């Protein structure tokens, strides 16, 4: 699972392999997997011409690193996971063009795009899901917190193409 630096996807089990934390007390009793962790090309505010140019360069570099991770791990990359807004330790926002680049990479390589909406879903951004502010659509959404339960939503059209998929 390709994921990003400065991400927060949880503090238990496999989610720790996707979360950046430097406090060993939080992960010492859990397995940690060496999955590809990619540069985080979030926007830097204020959005000046200089900051935007830096963001675009970082997006291109992140997409290149993802391509390299896919090529060096053939048939081993199942998904890319990202929070539409990284909300741990500040707000990190992404450009629509970056999410579209992720969507294209996933489509070209037959891997899933997962949006972790645990902190951003259920109307907190003004839309039901934060990804609805962008053009790229995920294959899977994870959600929780505000719903009092956690869950996973999957793209019906995509998964109906797969006989006996786990979402039937």
Language-model segments: which ranges?
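Conserved N-terminal phosphate-binding loop of PLP-dependent enzymes in the Aspartate aminotransferase
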Residues: 2-168
């Amino acid at each position: 699972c390709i994921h990003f630096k400065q991400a927060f996807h949880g503090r238990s089990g496999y989610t720790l392999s996707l979360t950046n934390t430097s406090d060993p007390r939080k992960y010492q009793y859990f397995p940690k997997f060496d999955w590809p962790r990619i540069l985080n090309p979030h926007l830097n505010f204020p959005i000046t011409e200089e900051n935007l140019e830096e963001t675009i360069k970082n997006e291109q570099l992140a997409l290149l690193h993802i391509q390299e991770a896919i090529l060096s791990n053939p048939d081993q990359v199942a998904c890319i996971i990202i929070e539409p807004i990284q909300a741990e330790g500040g707000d990190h926002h992404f450009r629509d063009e970056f999410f579209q680049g992720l969507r294209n990479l996933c489509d070209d390589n037959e891997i899933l795009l997962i949006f972790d909406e645990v902190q951003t879903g259920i109307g907190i951004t003004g839309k039901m899901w934060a990804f609805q502010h962008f053009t790229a659509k995920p294959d899977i959404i994870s959600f929780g917190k505000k719903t009092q339960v956690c869950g996973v939503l999957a793209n019906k059209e995509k998964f109906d193409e797969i006989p006996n998929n786990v979402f039937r």
